[in-house]
């Protein structure tokens, strides 16, 4: 099937064409296509499999369906480098995603309470580590995930420029909460960038090509500093709610801000990492903290590498060329993909909370005689049961539960005193190992 022609305007009917227009709208084939396109979005490949209205080519039908959907669309207030307008419609699939995000990501949600009270803490720590690593990788920095995770969990000092960048990226995710009451401004964005590159020898980083959002970058003429500064002002107005549709979903707007920062390259480098910080900060400002906790960058990465099933994310790839013209871009499939990736991340979080609750309940039932053990210690015991060869360290426990060093040390030493762990010297530091008799002592308990 031939590709749709790009940039071909649809001829507007004259009064003499009204009969033909009415006949088309009454045509059952076109009416069914228009209804489905408005509710669910029909992409070009799907249209190729459908019967077409009599007398219309596939390209004609595509353009007419786009025109019908355009009437009910939402438009982003910031154009791209080629001056094109971006718009989208909220499909039924998108609406379901927005509903899930509304229910679970707000500050007053049960999910947020679970994170604050403990059951989501381990996920939250792991999510921030994944985000710091994935955001650096998407911005073209060569990173060993295992080495980076070890760096962030151990608390050791950075040894090179890559270590420093990862530490800065990770630290920024924690520091953003302090900025939640500050409106977006060019100065705020500059502070985020300067904090990110603080102490980093940029010339020493090993780099790969940068990926921008879900689609490949479209080349355009160089942007002047004046034009970029103007876009940054528009960006801040949009982020602060001064422009744009006031009813727009927080999740959609957060993704739009992230991708605008990447597309316009606000800074000389690392616009993806800065964009991710903007995403999280905007979510916090709008009282959607859980949205900001989700490991969006790492799941973007999984999607782009083809590691997501079509049952959870509809589109395996995106080509905006099929839905764009010289003046505008239909961004509907991109918005749906962003929302579905967010829901995948949300499902991971909910699963992690459910597993933590089951583990906690099981270990609590096995430790009725040790009622004084706290939830962190029960978490250690559950982890030790599932991983009998694990080596536990104070710094890693401190990072995993966001406690001070003295508390983490006391947790582990108490478990040694109770006989659940044993302590051994490794070099100049102690590690903690599960007692060999731990499963028998707890009656064969296993991780849920």
Task: Report each predicted region and the residues it spans.
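Residue-level marker of regulatory loop/turn positions in helix-turn-helix DNA-binding domains and
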Residues: 121, 271, 373
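Active-site core of Fic-domain adenylyltransferases
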Residues: 87, 104-268, 276-293
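Residues that form generic nucleotide/phosphate-binding pockets
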Residues: 23-24, 36, 50, 67, ...
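Phosphate/pyrophosphate-binding active-site loops
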Residues: 2-76, 217-351
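Exposed alpha-helical structural elements
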Residues: 20, 60-63, 89-107, 119, ...
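Eukaryote-specific, low-hydrophobicity, charge-rich regions
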Residues: 54-121, 126, 130
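C-terminal regulatory or interaction extensions
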Residues: 258-266, 275-448
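Generic structural signal for alpha-helix starts
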Residues: 39, 90-91, 249, 374
């Amino acid at each position: 099937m031939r590709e749709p022609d790009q940039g071909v305007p649809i001829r507007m009917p004259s009064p003499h064409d009204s009969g033909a227009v009415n006949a088309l709208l009454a045509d059952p084939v076109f009416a069914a296509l228009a209804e489905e396109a408005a509710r669910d979005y029909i992409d070009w490949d799907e249209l190729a499999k459908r019967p077409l209205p009599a007398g219309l080519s596939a390209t004609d039908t595509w353009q007419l369906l786009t025109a019908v959907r355009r009437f009910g669309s939402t438009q982003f207030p910031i154009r791209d480098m080629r001056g094109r307008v971006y718009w989208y419609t909220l499909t039924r699939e998108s609406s379901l995603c927005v509903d899930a995000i509304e229910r679970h990501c707000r500050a007053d949600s049960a999910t947020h309470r679970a994170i604050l009270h403990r059951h989501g803490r381990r996920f939250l720590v792991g999510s921030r580590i994944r985000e710091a690593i994935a955001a650096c990788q998407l911005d073209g920095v060569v990173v060993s995930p295992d080495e980076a995770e070890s760096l962030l969990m151990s608390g050791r000092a950075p040894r090179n420029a890559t270590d420093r960048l990862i530490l800065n990226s990770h630290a920024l995710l924690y520091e953003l909460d302090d900025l939640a009451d500050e409106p977006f401004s060019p100065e705020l964005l500059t502070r985020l960038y300067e904090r990110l590159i603080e102490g980093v020898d940029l010339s020493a980083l090993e780099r790969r090509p940068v990926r921008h959002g879900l689609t490949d970058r479209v080349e355009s003429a160089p942007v002047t500093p004046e034009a970029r500064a103007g876009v940054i002002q528009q960006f801040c107005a949009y982020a602060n709610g001064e422009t744009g549709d006031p009813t727009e979903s927080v999740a959609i707007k957060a993704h739009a801000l992230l991708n605008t920062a990447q597309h316009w390259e606000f800074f000389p480098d690392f616009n993806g990492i800065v964009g991710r910080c903007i995403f999280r900060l905007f979510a916090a400002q709008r009282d959607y903290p859980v949205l900001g906790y989700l490991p969006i960058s790492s799941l973007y990465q999984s999607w782009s590498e083809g590691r997501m099933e079509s049952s959870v994310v509809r589109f395996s790839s995106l080509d905006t060329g099929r839905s764009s013209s010289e003046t505008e871009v239909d961004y509907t499939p991109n918005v749906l993909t962003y929302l579905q990736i967010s829901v995948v991340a949300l499902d991971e979080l909910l699963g992690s909370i459910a597993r933590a609750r089951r583990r906690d309940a099981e270990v609590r039932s096995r430790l009725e005689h040790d009622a004084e053990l706290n939830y962190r210690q029960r978490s250690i015991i559950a982890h030790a049961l599932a991983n009998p060869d694990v080596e536990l360290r104070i710094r890693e426990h401190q990072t995993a539960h966001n406690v001070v060093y003295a508390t983490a040390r006391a947790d582990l030493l108490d478990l040694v005193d109770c006989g659940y762990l044993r302590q051994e010297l490794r070099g100049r530091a102690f590690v903690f190992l599960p007692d060999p008799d731990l499963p028998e002592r707890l009656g064969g308990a296993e991780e849920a």
